[in-house]
Curated annotation (Swiss-Prot):
Monomer in solution. Homodimer; when bound to DNA. Component of a transcription-coupled nucleotide excision repair (TC-NER) complex composed of STK19, ERCC6, ERCC8, DDA1, DDB1, ELOF1 and UVSSA which assembles and interacts with the multiprotein RNA polymerase II complex when it stalls at DNA lesions. The keyword Nucleus applies. This is Winged helix repair factor 1. Residues 32-104 are annotated as: Winged helix domain 1. One of its GO terms (biological process) is positive regulation of single strand break repair.
Length: 254
C-alpha cells in the first residue's frame, strides 16, 4: 500500500514530471518525494488564508504529510527533526488523539503577537513566546515546568489560557494551542466527513481521484477538496488503487 501511494500521489497531485514521450504534466502540488519539509511547505499553500482573514497561521495535519511521504517512520523522524530545530510547532487539535496540526514557528509567533496586541494578556504572551517557545518544543507543558523553570505566575498562566495560547489538558497541564483555531477545527471535521461521504455515495463506494477533484465541492467543504483528499489518503480513510484510468479512491472494507 505504501509503495503504491508513494508512486500515486506525486503523479496525481503534484510533481511536474518529464516523460520520455508526451507533454509535461502539471498539478497543484510539487512536493519532493520523501521530504517532510517540502511536503509541509507544499501543503501550506493549500491552506485558505483568506477564509480566516489571515488571522490564523497556515495549518497542515500530520496525516496530510503522510499522503506525500508515505513511509510514516521517515515522515515522523523528519518532522521530529524540524520540531527540535525549532522550525515547526506541533499542536494537538483536540478532535482526535492523533489529530496533530503542524505550523511554522515563525508564522505561529507572528499571528499570536498580532492577536494579543493591545490586550491585557499581551505581556504574558510575549513572555511565553520569548522564553518557553524557543526552549521547549513539546506539545504540552506541566505546571512545575511553567512556574519553576520559566518563572510564570499562576495569574500569567491564566492569561495564556485566556489568550488561547494554552488549553487545559488536565489538572496542572496544558496543551500548546493556536488562538482562534476553533473555527478551523469545525470546518476541518465537517469537511472531512463531507468529502468522505462523496466517496461513500459513489457506485461501489469508490471514485476516481480526478473525478472527485473535478466535482463541485459541497458548501461545508470550506478548506478545499484537495486539502481534504490529502488528509483522507494519509489518514488511511480511503485506499489508493492504481488503474488505467488513474488513481481510484476506495473506502476500506469493514
Amino acid at each position: 500500500m505504501s509503495w503504491k501511494r508513494h508512486h500515486l500521489i506525486p503523479e496525481t497531485f503534484g510533481v511536474k514530471r518529464r516523460r520520455k514521450r508526451g507533454p509535461v504534466e502539471s498539478d497543484p502540488l510539487r512536493g519532493e518525494p520523501g521530504s517532510a519539509r517540502a511536503a509541509v511547505s507544499e501543503l501550506m499553500q493549500l491552506f485558505p488564508r483568506g477564509l480566516f482573514e489571515d488571522a490564523l497561521p497556515p495549518i497542515v495535519l500530520r496525516s496530510q504529510v503522510y499522503s506525500l511521504v508515505p513511509d510514516r517512520t521517515v515522515a515522523d523522524r523528519q518532522l521530529k527533526e524540524l520540531q527540535e530545530q525549532g522550525e515547526i510547532r506541533i499542536v494537538q487539535l483536540g478532535f482526535d488523539l492523533d489529530a496533530h496540526g503542524i505550523i511554522f514557528t515563525e508564522d505561529y509567533r507572528t499571528r499570536v503577537l498580532k492577536a494579543c496586541d493591545g490586550r491585557p494578556y499581551a505581556g504574558a504572551v510575549q513572555k511565553f513566546l520569548a522564553s518557553v517557545l524557543p526552549a521547549c518544543g513539546d506539545l504540552s507543558f506541566q505546571q512545575d515546568q511553567m512556574t519553576q523553570t520559566f518563572g510564570f505566575r499562576d495569574s500569567e498562566i491564566t492569561h495564556l489560557v485566556n489568550a488561547g495560547v494554552l488549553t487545559v489538558r488536565d489538572a496542572g497541564s496544558w496543551w500548546l494551542a493556536v488562538p482562534g483555531a476553533g473555527r478551523f477545527i469545525k470546518y476541518f471535521v465537517k469537511g472531512r466527513q463531507a468529502v468522505l461521504s462523496m466517496v461513500r455515495k459513489a457506485k461501489y463506494r469508490e471514485l476516481l481521484l480526478s473525478e472527485l477533484l473535478g466535482r463541485r465541492a459541497p458548501v461545508v467543504v470550506r478548506l478545499g477538496l484537495t486539502y481534504h483528499v490529502h488528509d483522507l489518503i494519509g489518514a488511511q480513510l480511503v485506499d489508493c488503487i492504481s488503474t488505467t484510468s488513474g488513481t481510484l479512491l476506495r473506502l476500506p472494507e469493514t
